[in-house]
Every structure is written in structure tokens, then in C-alpha cells.
Amino acid sequence: MAPINLNLILAFSLALLGVLIYRTHLMSTLLCLEGMMLSLFILMTLLISHFHMYSMAMAPLILLVFSACEAGVGLALLVKISTSYGNDYVQNLNLLQC
């Protein structure tokens, strides 16, 4: 396995570990999710160019669009929680249930 692929898989694993460990604040969870999406984007781009699958060239861009939408929704939720409750604890997400 190429060292760049190993580094990207390690970056994804560390970001996933960060999501599992830093669950108290929503901002740290969102940052770890963005790290996961960025490492997936770079890994997907490198694998497509390495295996010459140019018919799948739009897949990383679609992943990037979904990542931007996820970041926008996450930041909107962060603003809503922090203005309503004064903090960004993930445990406040249970209060948003209908």
C-alpha cells in the first residue's frame, strides 16, 4: 500500500476516533466530521486517478457537495443550540425532539 493511502486512512481513522471521543461539544464533533469527509475526498480522488476510472471523476465532487451541505446544516444547528441554550453541548440535542 502506498504511504499516501496509508496516511489518508490513518487520518480518517483518527477523525473517526475524534468523533467517538469528543462527543461533549458539537463544534469538535463537526470538525472531526469535516476531517473525515476531507480525507475521504482526497482518498477517492487519488484512487480514481490511480486506477484510471475517469467515468467516476464526478464522484469526489458530489462527495464534496454533500460535505458542504452537511457543514451548513451542522453550523445552523450549532447556532440554534448556542443561541437557545448558551452552550454547544451535544446532550442538548435531545431537547430538540418533537
From Swiss-Prot:
The chain crosses the membrane at residues 1-21, 28-48, 59-79. GO terms for molecular function: NADH dehydrogenase (ubiquinone) activity. It is found in: Mitochondrion inner membrane. It catalyses: a ubiquinone + NADH + 5 H(+)(in) = a ubiquinol + NAD(+) + 4 H(+)(out). One of its GO terms (biological process) is ATP synthesis coupled electron transport. GO terms for cellular component: mitochondrial inner membrane; respiratory chain complex I. It is a multi-pass membrane protein. Belongs to the complex I subunit 4L family. This is NADH-ubiquinone oxidoreductase chain 4L. It comes from Perameles gunnii. The lineage of its organism: Eukaryota, Metazoa, Chordata, Craniata, Vertebrata. The gene is MT-ND4L.
